[in-house]
């Protein structure tokens, strides 16, 4: 069976790109464990050295979406997440943003995983906060219904990735796999804010989101960070209504002070959970500012506000009046509930 992939590998070795059909079929085969580990490693390394195309990223994400376990729901959900891999070890920003967004009235399907290169991934800090990260589909839906936010544990929804996970770990460098998490939300989010770890991915990821059916999405990179940042300038590629727009954002433009990276540097899950709890309890400072900026982007992408500055103001209000804290409490309760309403059924 593995001989069937040799022509495709030869094409990649010659520096050629794969069309979407070939890329999707190959990646689907990877998710079934058909190519050998050496063949998978060769393919993704060749793409990395040449530079992954929008078509290849889109096709691989499409194959991964098809293999996923999906969460059924009636809502227009939003996801805020990053590719990871920026190496800055910040506090959990997009996780905190999820609670602010939910507190502000959005339905948030937060897709995430345990830490790979950081000290504390979304799953790690949520577990430290008391969330059942292994919640069933019914519990996830119950959380979305009642708290406005659910957590979709990537390793549970994308079980087919078990075939390539050891290869990723053995390679030890970024490949196309690192881009796919934010592009494969199991709840089918069509509104997204996606942070990327390097400038070169800003535009391709936005285009891939558009090709995958996003209605409105931002792909962002902020001064080395896979978030909108208050430490400098953020590059944004916005996909909206079938077209792409590129622009930059500074914290000063939306009324926020500039911060030093040291002010938002995190630690282990317990440390980051304590910081997130303090944030939801009303603590002011650089962590609050960067969370408000990213939450503002979520509100804007979801058409909840008309300007980013208005989004910052809404985020501050949600933190101050306890709505964000209530969203966390609701997520903890729903994911640990042993009795889920009968009308909530898995997809």
Swiss-Prot record:
It catalyses: N-(5-phospho-beta-D-ribosyl)anthranilate + diphosphate = 5-phospho-alpha-D-ribose 1-diphosphate + anthranilate. One of its GO terms (biological process) is L-tryptophan biosynthetic process. Its cofactor is Mg(2+). GO terms for cellular component: cytosol. The keyword Amino-acid biosynthesis applies. 5-phospho-alpha-D-ribose 1-diphosphate binds at residues 82, 85-86, 90, 92-95, 110-118, 122. Pathway: Amino-acid biosynthesis; L-tryptophan biosynthesis; L-tryptophan from chorismate: step 2/5. Keywords: Amino-acid biosynthesis, Aromatic amino acid biosynthesis, Glycosyltransferase, Magnesium, Metal-binding, Transferase, Tryptophan biosynthesis. Pfam families: Glycos_trans_3N, Glycos_transf_3. Mg(2+) 1 binds at residues 94, 227. SUPFAM superfamilies: Nucleoside phosphorylase/phosphoribosyltransferase catalytic domain (SSF52418), Nucleoside phosphorylase/phosphoribosyltransferase N-terminal domain (SSF47648). Mg(2+) 2 binds at residues 226-227. Its EC number is 2.4.2.18. InterPro entries: Anthranilate_Pribosyl_Tfrase (IPR005940), Glycosyl_Trfase_fam3 (IPR000312), Glycosyl_Trfase_fam3_N_dom (IPR017459), Glycosyl_Trfase_fam3_N_dom_sf (IPR036320), Nuc_phospho_transferase (IPR035902). Binds 2 magnesium ions per monomer. One of its GO terms (molecular function) is magnesium ion binding. Anthranilate 2 binds at residue 168. Anthranilate 1 binds at residues 82, 113. Catalyzes the transfer of the phosphoribosyl group of 5-phosphorylribose-1-pyrophosphate (PRPP) to anthranilate to yield N-(5'-phosphoribosyl)-anthranilate (PRA). PANTHER family: ANTHRANILATE PHOSPHORIBOSYLTRANSFERASE. Belongs to the anthranilate phosphoribosyltransferase family. Homodimer. This is Anthranilate phosphoribosyltransferase. The gene is trpD.
